[in-house]
A protein has these predicted regions:
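Cofactor-binding active-site loop characterized by glycine-rich and histidine/acidic residues
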Residues: 1-89
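Conserved thiamine diphosphate
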Residues: 60-63, 102, 110-161
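Generic beta-sheet signal
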Residues: 63-67, 94, 171-179
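Active-site metal-binding loops of divalent metal-dependent hydrolases
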Residues: 70-73, 100, 179
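Active-site glycine- and acidic-residue-rich loops that bind
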Residues: 72-78, 151-159, 225-227
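Short internal beta-strands
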Residues: 93-100, 104
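Glycine/aspartate-rich loop-and-adjacent alpha/beta segment that forms the canonical ThDP
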Residues: 155-213
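Conserved N-terminal beta1-alpha1 strand-loop-helix module at the mouth
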Residues: 214-235
């Protein structure tokens, strides 16, 4: 959707998501305008990003590379190979975001391959709130990364974390962004069944109504000036 807003393709094309013949598939497709690299199979994206960042340093380019990885994706060994490589070569012009929503294709991450600790039952809420149970950051620190942990629903925290990451020298940074998948949507919130599918047409108006009633774009974001964002964001 962000790429549609940026003008890479018409917003109406979003309705073709994951349909046969569509340029918008579950993983980025090279046929899609604006896509230079296909991030599937899972786990390859961080390696690719490390390569771009390292090449920029070798070529003395003032580039900073940002990448997003999933917590379910972190089941893949290649993620951790890339983590070791970035640390070894001190790729400090790389910032990774880990979308820590505790959900992957089949179920909750802590039931399949825990990053924090084993989950008993289906209630992830208490683990999301209890920082004493978070072990993911320790894993990344052990690989030599600078670790920042934030509430991924707070734009001002995201902005502050990016600023800190850009100022960090000698090591790559990972921003562990704790989120609730499908937040505030009755049909989707914290439900693994919605991991990778588009809603049916009869549900779309309900979803749009729920979103319109709860969210607005802060003036600071529109203006590109974050200095007063914390005062504008009330939730």
């Amino acid at each position: 959707s962000n790429m549609a807003v940026a003008g890479y393709f018409p917003e109406s094309e979003i309705e073709t998501l994951r349909k046969f013949g569509s340029r918008l598939q579950g993983h980025p497709d090279l046929k899609c305008p604006g896509v230079e690299f296909c991030g599937g199979s899972l786990g390859t994206g961080l390696s690719y990003s490390v390569g771009i960042a390292l090449a920029a340093k070798i070529d003395s380019k003032d580039h900073h590379v940002y990448t997003i990885i999933g917590d379910g994706e972190s089941d893949e060994g290649q993620v951790w190979e890339a983590a070791m490589t970035a640390s070894k070569y001190k790729v400090d012009n790389l910032t990774a975001f880990l979308d820590r929503n505790f959900i992957q294709q089949d179920s909750y991450t802590e039931k399949i391959m825990p990053l924090d600790e084993n989950l008993e039952g289906d209630d992830i809420a208490e683990m999301w709130k209890d920082a004493s149970r978070w072990k993911t950051g320790d894993k990344w620190r052990s690989f030599g990364w600078n670790v920042l942990e934030i509430d991924g629903h707070r734009v001002e925290q995201i902005d502050a974390a990016i600023t800190k990451a850009n100022a960090t020298k000698g090591v790559p940074t990972i921003i562990i962004s704790r989120t609730i998948k499908g937040k505030s949507l009755e049909h989707m919130e914290d439900n693994p069944q919605w991991h990778g599918k588009a809603p049916d047409s009869d549900i779309v108006p309900i979803i749009n109504s729920e979103l319109d009633s709860q969210f607005l774009i802060a003036p600071s974001i529109i203006a590109g000036d974050m200095s007063n964002l914390e005062n504008e964001v009330k939730r």
